[in-house]
């Protein structure tokens, strides 16, 4: 397989289309198509679904994984030869709550690594592993303890979420001194919000139809929506603590949600990936429960 063709495949997946890949590679769209056709001919498989955005087929995912590993190792080799970093890309899948709470110290660490670039893909912690399997990222924060084939896994710690709402909302939706979980407005982060989707487990018997649900797809915006009374929600302990201390919100009951988090990364002999792993683990130890 031609390394140039593999790099072209990776660029298409990262950029989302053949046209965007042609701009990134400074070649014509027809040249991009010719390279992919040549690669598909060499392996005898269709590698890219021509959708918007373009996605790798099952066979293509295998080559995308290989291409991403090669790109990292090639960049590190250039570093060793030139004694400098050459815009080495580190791609990570992470959930929004982690990104807004314990993960930021990683930025401070990576900032001192020369020309290294960090690309984050935000997804629910129950779904970040799919990006790792597809080769879209080199590492992922996930709730899955079982390693993906070809990856190693490290336990990071436990993220605790608290059920909170404004005192006014709590007072307005109360039945016999308890929160009226069925009628109280609730918040969701998005369609893949596994944590919030299970918020009524242990609180209400059976399914509840037609709840009043607002969707706020931003960790910071979600917290503000809770603080300003749009609905109740499960907030990370670190995010909820200052609001509770200020009296902006109250904890609705003692039922908390503890989610173990893990770091999964490709098993590569990569100094930079090892340094990134150390930075992630250190940040998690400082910001998560054990």
UniProtKB/Swiss-Prot annotation:
Keywords tagged on the record: Activator, DNA-binding, Transcription, Transcription regulation
HTH lysR-type domain mapped to chain residues: 1-57
GO MF entry, a single one: DNA-binding transcription factor activity
UniProt DNA-binding region: 18-37
PROSITE patterns hit by this protein: HTH_LYSR
Gene3D superfamilies, sorted: 3.40.190.290, Winged helix-like DNA-binding domain superfamily/Winged helix DNA-binding domain (1.10.10.10)
PANTHER family: HTH-TYPE TRANSCRIPTIONAL REGULATOR ARGP, TRANSCRIPTIONAL REGULATOR
Similarity-based family: Belongs to the LysR transcriptional regulatory family.
Known role: Positively regulates the expression of the exporter LysE.
Protein name: Lysine export transcriptional regulatory protein LysG
Organism name: Corynebacterium efficiens (strain DSM 44549 / YS-314 / AJ 12310 / JCM 11189 / NBRC 100395)
Organism ancestry: Bacteria, Bacillati, Actinomycetota, Actinomycetes, Mycobacteriales
């Amino acid at each position: 397989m031609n390394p140039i063709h593999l790099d072209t495949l990776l660029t298409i997946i990262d950029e989302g289309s053949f046209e965007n890949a042609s701009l990134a590679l400074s070649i014509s769209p027809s040249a991009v198509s010719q390279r992919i056709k040549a690669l598909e001919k060499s392996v005898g498989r269709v590698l890219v679904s021509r959708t918007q955005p373009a996605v790798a087929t099952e066979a293509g995912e295998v080559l995308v994984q290989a291409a991403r590993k090669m790109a990292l190792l090639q960049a590190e080799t250039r570093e060793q030869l030139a004694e400098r970093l050459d815009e080495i890309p580190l791609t990570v899948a992470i959930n929004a709550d982690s990104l807004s709470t314990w993960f930021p110290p990683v930025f401070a660490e990576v900032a001192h690594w020369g020309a290294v670039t960090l690309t984050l893909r935000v997804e629910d912690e129950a779904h970040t592993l799919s990006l790792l399997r597809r080769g879209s990222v080199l590492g992922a924060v996930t709730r899955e303890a079982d390693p993906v084939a070809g990856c190693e896994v490290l336990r990071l710690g436990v993220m605790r979420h608290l059920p909170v709402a404004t005192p006014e909302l709590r007072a307005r939706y109360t039945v016999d001194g308890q929160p009226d979980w069925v009628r109280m407005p609730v918040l969701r982060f998005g369609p893949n919000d596994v944590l919030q989707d299970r918020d009524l487990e242990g609180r209400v018997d059976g399914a509840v139809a037609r709840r009043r649900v607002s969707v706020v797809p931003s960790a910071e915006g979600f917290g503000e929506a809770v603080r300003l009374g749009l609905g109740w929600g499960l907030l990370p302990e670190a995010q909820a603590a200052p609001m509770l201390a200020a009296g902006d919100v109250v904890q609705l009951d003692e039922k908390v949600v503890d989610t173990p988090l893990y770091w999964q990364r490709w098993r590569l002999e990569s100094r930079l990936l090892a340094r990134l792993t150390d930075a992630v683990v250190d940040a998690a130890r400082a910001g998560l429960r054990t």
